[in-house]
């Protein structure tokens, strides 16, 4: 379980994923928004570089928690 406010760089390092150098986000929530290109609803998920990210909690229009697990 990852907080939306978690640093994207640290998350990428721990998961072994590559983030674009020219990205305009710094958090896990920003990564989700950049990937989905819209505000998600609770329960939505996406896959990225072998990992599944599920939005498990929204606080209004803010992504509060993401569940990250191996895609498969």
Annotate each PLM feature:
Residues 1-72:
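Cytosolic regulatory modules rich in charged/polar residues
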């Amino acid at each position: 379980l990852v907080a939306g406010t978690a640093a994207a760089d640290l998350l990428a390092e721990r998961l072994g994923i590559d983030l674009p150098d020219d990205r305009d986000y710094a958090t896990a929530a920003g990564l989700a928004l950049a990937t989905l290109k819209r505000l998600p609803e609770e329960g939505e998920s996406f896959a990225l570089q072998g990992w599944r990210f599920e939005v498990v909690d929204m606080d209004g229009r803010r992504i509060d928690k993401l569940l990250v697990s191996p895609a498969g």
